Regions:
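Cysteine-nucleophile active-site neighborhood
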Residues: 1-59, 65, 122
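Hydrophobic/aromatic beta-strand patches that form the interior of the parallel beta-sheet core
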Residues: 17, 35, 67, 84, ...
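Histidine-centered divalent metal-coordination motifs
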Residues: 20, 70, 109
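Conserved hydrophobic/aromatic beta-strand scaffold that supports enzyme active sites
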Residues: 46-48, 93-95, 105
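Catalytic beta-strand/loop cores that center a nucleophilic Ser/Cys/Thr
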Residues: 54-100
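Short histidine/acidic/glycine/proline-rich micro-motifs that form metal-
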Residues: 73, 111-113
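Short helix/strand-capping connector loops at secondary-structure junctions
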Residues: 100-110
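Acyltransferase
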Residues: 113-130
């Protein structure tokens, strides 16, 4: 991806929300492993996403439907990122947040019409930027 880890991480000076490829770039910059999804490509399909209620998922239900369009996934995260959302049934990482800085990523597409709670995730990010 031609990633510059310093630019992406920004050392917390600029809040960052990575969606899909952006999530992958954030995680890769932190030393995560990216691979083809073990379940094959998922394009335009709603998936069940479970979360731990932290970061972007604050005050959301523990499970919701979100739209995915991707064939690559983060298998494990680096030292600074903490997974906080997973695909129901598979456990694939669907979201992660930085331990110290306002840096968040989601594998799914909250901006999609097929993601009913997507706007709440965007609003949570904006509130985390304050």
């Amino acid at each position: 991806m031609g990633i510059n880890g310093e630019l992406i991480s920004g050392k917390g000076q600029i809040p960052l929300l990575g969606i899909c490829l952006g999530h992958q770039a954030i995680c890769l910059a932190d030393g995560s492993n990216l691979t083809r999804s073990p379940n094959g490509p998922v394009h335009g399909s709603p998936v069940s996403v479970e979360n731990d209620g932290t970061g972007l998922f604050s005050e959301l239900a523990e499970e919701h439907s979100m739209m995915r369009y991707n064939s690559l996934v983060i298998l494990d995260v680096g030292e600074s990122m903490v997974p906080n959302a997973w695909e129901g049934g598979t456990g694939l990482i669907m979201g992660a947040r930085h331990r110290y800085y306002p840096i968040h990523g989601v594998q799914f597409h909250p901006e999609s019409a097929g993601s009913p709670d997507g706007m709440a995730i965007i609003e949570n990010f904006l509130s985390l930027c304050d």
